[in-house]
């Protein structure tokens, strides 16, 4: 984590940014999870990551009792998980609320797969859970993001970022040609142009950044992915609420992989904590989640941690530790 933080702080596009690391910081792919920073006119797509808009949808229901077996059945029968998506004939109706053809990179992503992914959980650390607070109120939480669509968008713009830094622009090529002509070296133009197809990138590929028009296009497409992730979670919650006959008394959303465009703040594994804002911080299956209220601390980019953090990957933990049964873990 320390090496990744140092590497990030040494990048040219971070100069002048207010960078803050959350208490749950841990190493990620390319950068640390638990990062928040202010941005201006450049950004590395990898800092947001591949699960654009990932977060939690939380509802508090009127009911004081639920049937766990029925809830489990509703979820398993109505919400695809893992690599599964919906059939085109069985898409959730919320897919009509977003137009993926508006993406600048629409021809580089699987739009139809995206529509069929609305209302699907995915894998990894994504989850659906029921919680009860100290006053007996019951909450349902859905944690998921933009699914494969977010991955495709992130990979496209990260590749485009690196290409933009290693490929000479038309203006640069024209300047080289003009210099050769002014030096009387017109005959060398074609041979020299063949040797300068690539230039050295000022940053590593995984930390390459978008700027100018590419920056604006990324922000545009990222916002669409964030909207997609929000609809995805709400679609799953819709399945649960209708299947269980729940009555919603309160709901709120907590996002942790995105750029707050209104305030130009990037949050990677951190969440918005504006003054008075209600947010959710999940800990683990045994200890549940924390319902918190933001303090609006500007020095910390109006942000809070998105979880408890971890010392190793899930796969490494499975190899080193024997998990107790869910009942034993919850009762410990």
Regions of interest found by a model, annotated:
Residues 34-39, 45-48, 126-132, 291-296, ...:
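Short beta-strand elements
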Residues 321-326:
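Conserved small/polar residues in nucleotide/adenosyl-binding loops
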Residues 1-15, 118-120:
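N- or domain-start disorder-to-order transition segments that initiate the globular core
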Residues 282-304, 311-319:
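Hydrophobic alpha-helical bundle architecture
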Residues 97-98, 102-132, 203-295:
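Accessory "access/gating" subregions that flank catalytic or transport cores
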Residues 24-35, 44-56, 138-153, 300-314:
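Conserved phosphate/anionic-ligand binding catalytic regions in large, soluble enzymes, centered on
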Residues 46-90, 100:
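A generic, well-ordered mixed alpha/beta core segment in the N-terminal half of proteins
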Residues 148-154, 158, 164-247:
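A conserved active-site cap/scaffold subdomain adjacent to cofactor or substrate pockets
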């Amino acid at each position: 984590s320390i090496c990744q933080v140092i590497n990030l702080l040494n990048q040219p596009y971070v100069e002048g940014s207010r960078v803050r690391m959350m208490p749950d910081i841990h190493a990620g792919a390319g950068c640390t999870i638990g990062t928040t920073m202010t941005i201006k006119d450049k950004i590395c797509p990898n800092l947001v990551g591949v699960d654009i808009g990932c977060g939690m949808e939380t509802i508090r229901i009127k009911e004081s009792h639920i049937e766990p077996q029925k809830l489990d059945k509703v979820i398993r029968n109505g919400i695809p998980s893992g690599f599964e998506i919906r059939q085109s004939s069985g898409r959730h109706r919320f897919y009509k609320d977003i137009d993926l053809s508006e993406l600048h990179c629409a021809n580089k992503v699987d739009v139809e797969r995206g529509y069929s992914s609305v209302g699907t959980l995915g894998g990894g650390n994504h989850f659906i859970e029921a919680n009860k607070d100290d006053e007996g109120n019951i909450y349902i939480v859905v944690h998921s993001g933009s699914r494969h669509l977010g991955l495709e968008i992130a990979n496209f713009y990260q590749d485009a970022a690196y290409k933009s830094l290693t490929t000479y622009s038309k203006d640069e090529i024209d300047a080289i040609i003009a210099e050769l002509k002014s030096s009387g070296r017109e005959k060398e133009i074609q041979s020299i142009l063949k040797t300068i197809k690539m230039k050295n990138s000022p940053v590593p590929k995984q930390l390459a950044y978008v700027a100018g028009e590419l920056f604006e296009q990324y922000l545009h497409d990222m916002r669409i992915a964030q909207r997609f992730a929000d609809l995805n979670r709400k679609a799953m919650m819709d399945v649960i609420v209708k299947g269980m006959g729940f009555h919603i008394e309160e709901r709120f959303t907590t996002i942790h992989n995105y750029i707050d465009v209104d305030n130009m703040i990037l949050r990677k594994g951190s969440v918005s904590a504006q003054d008075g804002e209600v947010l959710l911080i999940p800990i683990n299956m045994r200890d549940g989640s924390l319902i918190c209220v933001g303090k609006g601390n500007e020095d910390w980019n109006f942000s809070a941690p998105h979880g408890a953090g971890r010392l190793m990957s899930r796969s490494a933990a499975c190899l080193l530790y024997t998990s107790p049964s869910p009942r034993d873990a919850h009762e410990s």
